[in-house]
Amino acid sequence: MKYDHQQIEAKWQKFWQDNQTYRSDDNFQKPKYYVLDMFPYPSGAGLHVGHVVGYTATDIIARYMRTKGYNVMHPMGWDSFGLPAEQYAIRTGTHPAESTQENINNYRRQLRALGFSYDWNRELATSDPNYYKWTQWIFTKLYEKGLAYEAEMLVNYCPALGTVLANEEIENGKTKDGGHPVERRPLKQWILKITAYADRLLQDLDLLDWPESLKKLQINWIGKSEGAYVQFIEKTTQEAFSVFTTRPDTLFGVSYLVLAPEHPLVSHITASSQQQAVRAYQAQIASKSDLDRTELNRDKTGVFTGAYAVNPVNHKEIPIWISDYVLMNVGTGAIMAVPAHDERDFEFAKTFKLPIIPVYDPVCEEITIRNQVLAGQQCWPGHGICVNSACGDLSLNGLNLDQAKKIVINWLEINHKGKSATTYKLRDWLFSRQRYWGEPFPLLKFEDGSVRLLDEDELPLCPPAITNYKPTGDGKGPLTQIKEWVEIIDTKTGKKAFRDTNIMPQWAGSCWYYLRFCDPHNTEKAFSPEKEKYWLPVDLYIGGVEHAVLHLLYARFWHKVLYDCGYVHTLEPFQTLRNQGLVVARSYQNKMRVYVEPRYVEQRDGKYFDSRTGEELTSQIDKMSKSKLNGESPDEIIQEYGADALRLYEMFMGPLEKEKVWNTDAVSGTRRFLNRFYEMAFSDKVTNETSEEGLKLGHRLVHSVMKDMELLQFNTAIAKMMEFINEFTKLVTYPKQVIQMATQVLAPFAPHLAEEVWEHLKCEGSLSFTPYPQVEEKYLQENVITYVVQINGKVRGRFDLPKDQTQENVLEAAKNNPHIQQYINKKEIGKVVFVPNKLLSIVLR
């Protein structure tokens, strides 16, 4: 009987949909498991196979946990507000709501075709008024707690997109979305005070089962620094200004000060002889982004103001410069430069021939380095013993860093010259966008400058229907053009009022969607306390690491605010998080750097050619993307090989968290495995009789795959299924009981085929909730030993063999093992040490 994947998959998808198999009930008596994907933005391109990795992983776990007795919630929704839909509307004239719904329908079709066990009754979209009503409501809570405020500030403005962007949305001076140039402009914006939660965002990372690398990204982004504020006095004007430093112990080594070009003090202190140069420099750097300005490898630039400040510890006069590497929104917008012990200061000092004063002796270093450091010829950012650091009643000479730091901070505080302090790199979150397709701000502004938050019964505030979505180009959004929407009479006060013409960023809706999934149809509340208490926290969250300092940081911030307001009971939203690795694929370009579709590419002698023109192409491995024409749609693969084969291949390519190179042809390998499984289950050899050997194979399979499932090691679990079928099909007859066990193990990975086999074996009910097989220890006991192989004293491999093998047999097995072979590599074996049932040690000549 042939394995007809199209017929089987259509049959079982209809069964699941008709029976609402995966609908999760709020059964508070049953242990819950909440498994969640980072929900997608529904783009016009649809899903590609790179997206499928994370969705397959969560589906495997959702299916597995149902068979372990858990009440599983596995929902799906759409992050449907945002710039891409609006850009599409500008190009085509299609309203974003219309194009977004079309894209959602396509995504839903693709996800259903993959057999994912989502609870579609909980489906939501952030652009649905029934959803964003509560996004706006949460904003009112932020405002009431003093965490939302308006301020004019220098912002990252993208002329091409016509909107302001947060630092997190920019990379190498360009927008992450589209790579458009960004400039700095002063604009009045809505800002969320995420910095008020900086310490808690850091501390509570310890509560989470997240990859350490991801935690480190958040730790570095928050950037907690402990040090001191030091007060300097400008000599002529006597104006005081503060500098934050993590190294107050180096104050005696300060040889110049640097202000951000935008610092308000610059215009007051600049000498008349330097005013023209300072203004020219300010104009020159005005359009540079923060990232451009702080790039470590770029040439150092700056201008002397002609002013001097007095060093509080030794009363020496220090020149004051301006330079673009100092940012007004970091620290105080001023730094003290110690070129002898800071690489960037050292480069700046060398460029402008400024003094270099060493105040640390690197006593443990070799004499040449030590002499160069003490002569000011080499920068030494490390520790040592303080030198050249005494004046009056303050002496740090002979002290180490910790001792010196403590004493100088104490001296600064006693003498009212400074104080200890903790600062953060994290900036408050720029929360407004000058676009149309997003949540309007739920408030009214009055002519006297006062603000009224909209009451809950006035929500949602929906954007007006418009036909022109283009940004105005003056930093204002398209809503400014709709006077009848902007200027109104407030029905509750009778006063003339103005609606805000900015909208919230795309991140707003994704900050809390995991909460709405708990209670998606509630019209009275964002979610009920009982359901939140039952379902939260999310037990497993899977998505890309690129969201580390965007969505994940923002969602944690909102959650903590809701916790403080008493709306949620957990300190954190996502207990366990895993990142899936990128799926990359070959892309091809012609000599004009135009990308060529893979279907037009042919390979000859290791080179690539355009089959239409014969032109040789360049090829590289790239992240899958529509622009590079290397994003493979799952639709064609499902048609040819089946959803189960695709799901298996997505997981078999490699460890979940690692980058993987896509190869469509390799899907045939997992399809062949499914063919074999199907043929085995439908074979005439299937018998109701059991066998010791068959039961051992079955129980070992269940035992080993369960361990892999707990660790999300899906590739090795699939490998074990393949090993199982190799051994099992060597049996004279196939015990039905063992096939049932193997089918249950396969089910989370290839659910359509597994259901078909289960039905054929005349087993009761759907596999979806059939308890996972119980392992019997007696079938795990086997006369099999794992031998450790050492080569020249280093462990080079392990393999299993039956117990009590001779040295000759174990040595022969080692020689034939591909992994161990590469270390022997035809070299002569000089000596062999054999410990029976444990170790084989080989010494090569």
Curated annotation (Swiss-Prot):
GO terms for biological process: leucyl-tRNA aminoacylation. A motif ('KMSKS' region) lies at residues 623-627. It catalyses: tRNA(Leu) + L-leucine + ATP = L-leucyl-tRNA(Leu) + AMP + diphosphate. The keyword ATP-binding applies. ATP binds at residue 626. InterPro entries: aa-tRNA-synth_I_CS, aa-tRNA-synth_Ia, Leu-tRNA-ligase, Leu_tRNA-synth_edit, M/V/L/I-tRNA-synth_anticd-bd, Methionyl/Leucyl_tRNA_Synth, Rossmann-like_a/b/a_fold, tRNAsynth_Ia_anticodon-bd. The keyword Membrane does not apply. GO terms for cellular component: cytosol. One of its GO terms (molecular function) is leucine-tRNA ligase activity. This is Leucine--tRNA ligase. The lineage of its organism: Bacteria, Pseudomonadati, Chlamydiota, Chlamydiia, Parachlamydiales.
